[in-house]
Regions:
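Helix-coil boundary/capping segments in enzymes
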Residues: 1-196
Length: 196
């Protein structure tokens, strides 16, 4: 919500970007996009169980509110399978549940939880992604304070300082994927880093 366009707030006062008809007009018709991949960021729970419950609810909401035949009549919305990376087994179950959905285009994770992605504990996620040939996307998220990236000069004072630090987090996660052998174990795994 820090960088939302003011014109994305619907007339009914709901959250920015929450109205499929308004977003269709702005993102598809006016911007000229062929499709739009939705990346809902509904995380922030400190407990893995709560993060998993949030991911499950988000997927149900995306399916009902954005991908139904009523709101996706034009077939140009694509959803993201939100998963709680903190609960790899639960995340894999959620991937299995939604992998066959015709409009779920990718798996959505966040970068902040520790340990880094190369840790074998995350293998159920990578295994499910490669089994179903679905790209894993990581979008910037705002985790709890102790999970945020810390720049070499200390904690950020301003939002723009904080945003720049995400490139460090992304670089560390990519190094972990490579050096900890994830791409050796799952050579067809595809990962996209958004806004890093």
């Amino acid at each position: 919500a820090y960088a939302m366009r003011v014109d994305t707030f619907p007339d009914d006062g709901e959250f920015a970007g929450s109205d499929p008809d308004l977003m269709f007009r702005q993102l598809i018709m006016e911007a000229g996009a062929d499709i739009a991949i939705l990346e809902p960021l509904a995380f922030g729970a400190r407990l893995p169980e709560a993060a998993q419950a949030s991911a499950i609810a988000t997927n149900l909401w995306i399916d009902e509110h954005w991908l139904s035949s009523t709101t996706n009549w034009h077939q140009r919305w694509r959803g993201s399978i939100s998963v709680a990376i903190e609960d790899p087994e639960g995340a894999a179950r959620e991937i299995e549940k939604w992998a066959g959905h015709p409009y779920m285009a990718q798996i959505l994770i966040k970068a902040e939880p520790r340990p880094s992605w190369g840790d074998p504990r995350y293998d159920p996620i990578w295994q499910a992604a490669t089994k179903h040939d679905i790209t894993v996307s990581c979008h910037l998220a705002r985790g709890s304070f102790e999970t945020l990236p810390i720049p070499p000069v200390g904690f950020p004072s301003y939002n723009h300082d904080f945003m720049v630090s995400y490139s460090l987090l992304a670089a560390n996660q990519v190094m972990s994927l490579i050096f900890d052998g994830v791409f050796d174990r799952y050579p067809t795994l595809r990962i996209v880093l958004v806004e890093h």
